[in-house]
UniProtKB/Swiss-Prot annotation:
GO BP term, pick one: regulation of DNA-templated transcription
Organism: Erwinia tasmaniensis (strain DSM 17950 / CFBP 7177 / CIP 109463 / NCPPB 4357 / Et1/99)
Description of how the protein assembles with itself and partners: Homodimer.
Keywords associated with the record: Cell cycle, Cell division, Cytoplasm, DNA-binding
Protein name (Swiss-Prot/TrEMBL): Macrodomain Ter protein
Length: 150
């Protein structure tokens, strides 16, 4: 396993995930009968700071359809948690309009690179262009100064 599992931390994430799903109206328990489901949910709500109990609750009561999605969410969160420890693996998100993202993705595919690599290449291209324009402007100014002196 690439990322170490931290039981207490992940138990808290699972508790938050389940509570959030419950508040969004999803069925988080395996029970069809609403009173049994509500008893199980009430139990869960009381065990926020008891990681072992949360894990036992999950084993006993979780909706099987939700279990895999929760595992995927926790796996992604674990990855983000460990990646955030190092500057070179830390990720940030940006909002792009769909058409901008589409053009960027197409360019990345043509260049056979990731979106991040493509953005870095575009920035470097723009910086080189700016530097070239500054050099040309400076040369033009120097040339005018030389010709003006004569």
């Amino acid at each position: 396993m690439k990322y170490q599992q931290l039981e207490n931390l992940e138990s808290g994430w699972k508790w938050k995930y389940l509570v959030k799903k419950h508040r969004e109206g999803e069925l988080i328990t395996r029970y069809i009968e609403s009173s049994a489901a509500q008893v199980a949910v009430d139990e869960l709500l009381l065990m926020e700071n008891r990681p072992v109990d949360v894990l036992q609750w999950i084993d006993l009561h979780i909706n099987p359809k939700l279990e895999n999605r929760m595992k995927q969410t926790i796996r992604a969160r674990r990855k983000r948690h460990f990646n955030a420890e190092h500057q070179h693996t830390r990720k940030k998100s940006i909002d792009l309009e769909y058409l901008v993202w589409q053009r960027l993705a197409a360019l990345a595919q043509r260049r056979d690179s990731t979106l991040s690599e493509t953005i870095v290449q575009l920035i470097e291209d723009a910086e080189r262009k700016e530097q070239y324009a500054n050099q040309m402007s400076s040369l033009k100014h120097d040339l005018q100064a030389i010709l003006g002196k004569s």
